[in-house]
């Protein structure tokens, strides 16, 4: 008898859960649309050489050219390391092989410092655009953020992922701008 009562209770609970209204659909009727855009993660094809002083703090950049399944673990082997320790600069310039429309996803492996670390991202349709500063009169200041952000700074979480950007690009430059830090 006790088992029958328990079964009846479970069935009543299941019916109550199944019968609940979708509050998002009800509250957004007539002012929402389904997104049919698909998402695809693309691995860069090659590294573009940068002057030596800009890459002094870069170890194992080839790891960025390998497919990544998106799963970070505390033992993720063979990662790229960017370090600004001892006053070094840490920059990489990636070539995706063809112009894409979208943004980038950054994944950070485990590290000693658990705070979010700042990186500067520059998206460009050419190497010179990805290397240039936005606006100004400097010789390397030929790009703009007018139609979409292509030069921005963001924080990369500890043992986590972040996605940003919405632009047309083929090349992506990533600079670790956090002083005295290491990003894996």
Model-derived features: where do they sit?
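Cleavable N-terminal signal peptides
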Residues: 6-7, 17
